[in-house]
């Protein structure tokens, strides 16, 4: 992937950049692997906003991605197409399996049209192959990792994401996350070799507010610029208050302190002065 930077012909073009999409081989999705995707505007079933700053944006169709792959052990697949997916930052690859079935997977870095991909404990260690962590050598970079055996990939699915297998200890494998955290995962969990492609996605500059609206992001308004009825910071009276949310709550941790998976964390992610 490469990034195309626009010339500053207008204010909205200045510093704006976009992917050149040179790695894509097809512009329309596989019809049998597409489903309707309805918009919520960040509202729940009661119509109340539960996720702020969402709404609008271009219509999308959901592509069915295979995050499990364990039911295709021993069945080789050929990479037929590399496609764009509006629902995620990574590209997706269309696989044609030897038994005639077609499926989408997250496209790993370096994969190309015509490559053959394998699934199962006996698969080779090469990008795109999916196998249990216990069968992957220490030091290998992986992505699309399960948290529980046969639970489907949950970790490292976005563009450029990569996790390193740093050790194996009995029934567990130790993974170094993108955040720097090291945690244990059941060694029977599956992972895909390599890192996720489209790694330059983080370097793209939208350049103007309109491009944010195209992808469904609404503006963020400061509480201080609101009226008192809308936010505790609203109104002209300034100072004397600690920062709070629109509902008057101070800063709180978002992770439950007694979460069951805490015991799987070997070393927490660096924070504050320790963050590199």
From Swiss-Prot:
Gene Ontology terms for molecular function: rRNA binding; structural constituent of ribosome; transferase activity
Domain of life: Bacteria
Region (Disordered): 14-58, 219-276
Entries under InterPro entries matching the protein: NA-bd_OB-fold (IPR012340), Rib_uL2_dom2 (IPR014722), Ribosomal_uL2 (IPR002171), Ribosomal_uL2_bac/org-type (IPR005880), Ribosomal_uL2_C (IPR022669), Ribosomal_uL2_dom3 (IPR014726), Ribosomal_uL2_RNA-bd_dom (IPR022666), Translation_prot_SH3-like_sf (IPR008991)
Pfam families: Ribosomal_L2, Ribosomal_L2_C
Keyword annotations of the record: Ribonucleoprotein, Ribosomal protein, RNA-binding, rRNA-binding
Family per similarity comment: Belongs to the universal ribosomal protein uL2 family.
Entry-linked PANTHER family: LARGE RIBOSOMAL SUBUNIT PROTEIN UL2M, RIBOSOMAL PROTEIN L2
HAMAP family for this protein: Ribosomal_uL2_B
Subunit structure: Part of the 50S ribosomal subunit. Forms a bridge to the 30S subunit in the 70S ribosome.
Name under which the protein is recorded: Large ribosomal subunit protein uL2
Organism, scientific name: Bifidobacterium longum (strain NCC 2705)
